[in-house]
Amino acid sequence: TKYFESVSVKDIASHAQVERQTFYYYFSDKYQCLTFYLQQWGKLLAERDGSTNLQQHLLNLLDVIRKHKEAIIHITYGDQGYSLLSSFLDTALNEFILQSEGKKKTDTLDKGAQFFAYGVHGIIIEWIKKGMNDEPSILLSKTFPSSTESVDRLFSEF
């Protein structure tokens, strides 16, 4: 298996059993294809996750990431792939936090929520870099407060 940076459009087209022309009809390059792929994960998460509980949102996110462990690890070894994955995480985390606060996706996170989102983002990236050995539920229990009241208090203190 190759790291994403070394995968060519020819490799992707061959694996998908389509012609390169067909690939280029839909995508301008492999990074646009990766962006689309990550957006599909986001839609999958949104459909799968009707919860307003932030910890359940995070558990679902970690489960999806771990389910696609090999792909995620290969994506993170390269600047552009890492950047796209990081953007995906930012969007997902912001949406989860807003939803758990009963806000719209278009609303802006307050400072406490931004601080929390950046911290969670860093923890997830570190977990990915270390090979995702901890089960998602164990990672959450080690990392986050045992109640969402603590998180709500953090949001309101800023």
Can you say where each PLM-predicted feature lies in the sequence?
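Amphipathic alpha-helical segments used for helix-helix packing
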Residues: F36-L38, N60-L93
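C-terminal peripheral helix-coil segments that are non-catalytic and often amphipathic
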Residues: E126-F158
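Amphipathic alpha-helical packing segments from all-alpha helical-bundle domains
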Residues: Q56, D79-I124, P145-T148, D152
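Short helix-capping/hinge SLiMs at alpha-helix to coil transitions
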Residues: T1-F4, K130
